[in-house]
Amino acid sequence: MSKDVLKEQALDQNRKGTTTAHLDVAKHLAARVIMAFRCGFKVRSVSIDDFASPVDEIVCDWKNERATYANDAKLIRRAFGFVYIGTIIDQKSTDAPSAALRVQVDEDMTSAQEVREAAVEWNLVPTVADTNPLLHNGYKVASRLLREDPQLVEQLAAQLCQSRRMVQHELETWFGSHAKPLALEKLEDSSRFDW
């Protein structure tokens, strides 16, 4: 199915108010927002109503954190985690993915390619194919974070279903009042088996 057909199906479901599609997308995006905040990334907005433009569903420019991080490898690993955490949570569902969710996953794959290209551009690896170890580490951290923050993701997903759209200050306030302290470094350094 083409990306345009998937977008049209997602728009149609959105117009009909399909709550299952909204909840699936809300969980996917909530996981990404939680990962972003745990990484110290700023999230300008998140919306479950912007199916026509999946890039607007979550607006977070992780590349802007490069100066603050001063560690390109760590930033790239965390960016991979940010991109893939939604897909990890999607895999837990036994239902077939909605058209809206498939559109978001396609957009995540585009975002993953951007992370790969940044790793090459920043001279961390010689080619895009060499980014797999960085991707693997980011995926592991995202998986570990989902084990630590499952209720937080569910709570934010519920809030997104109610609010439909949240902007940066709303997200920061919500996160500050709901999230427990957690050092992402602890999860990155953990030797626990993840599969």
Where are these regions (language model features)?
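Soluble catalytic regions of large protease machineries
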Residues: 2-195
